[in-house]
Amino acid sequence: MSKFTSRELRARRHRRLRGQLSGTPERPRLNVFRSGLNIYAQVIDDLAGHTLVSASTIDTELRGSLGEQRKLEQAHSVGKAVAERARAAGITKVVFDRGGYKYHGRVKAVAEGAREGGLEF
């Protein structure tokens, strides 16, 4: 039996990744967080410590269009939305931060949606 829960292991992976990843004003960090029900994506400038743009499944703008979509499809829509907002803010290149999650499922769907929306990783 493992000494750590899966949540603790994810947090450890995320801390390890954050030591290697850093968002700059020229190439900010696209961070993904997923809960059991929702998914969140933020574009962050780590040097200034500011969130530049964000999108999530709880946004009022997206909530109506998500409707009866499955969580995987919702994640794809969130990726597209964050990419559109980033491009409107003049951001075209980002560093992808998977947040310690496996690059699979909803995290992968956010990344693919962001790529479709025009962001370069």
Curated annotation (Swiss-Prot):
What are the entry keywords?
Ribonucleoprotein, Ribosomal protein, RNA-binding, rRNA-binding
Q: Name one GO biological process term.
A: translation
Subunit relationships: Part of the 50S ribosomal subunit; part of the 5S rRNA/L5/L18/L25 subcomplex. Contacts the 5S and 23S rRNAs.
Known InterPro entries for this protein? Ribosomal_uL18_bac-type, Ribosomal_uL18_bac/euk
Q: Which family does it belong to?
A: Belongs to the universal ribosomal protein uL18 family.
The gene designation is rplR
MF terms per GO, please? 5S rRNA binding; structural constituent of ribosome
This chain's protein is named Large ribosomal subunit protein uL18
Disulfide cross-links: none
Q: What is the lineage of its organism?
A: Bacteria, Bacillati, Chloroflexota, Chloroflexia, Herpetosiphonales
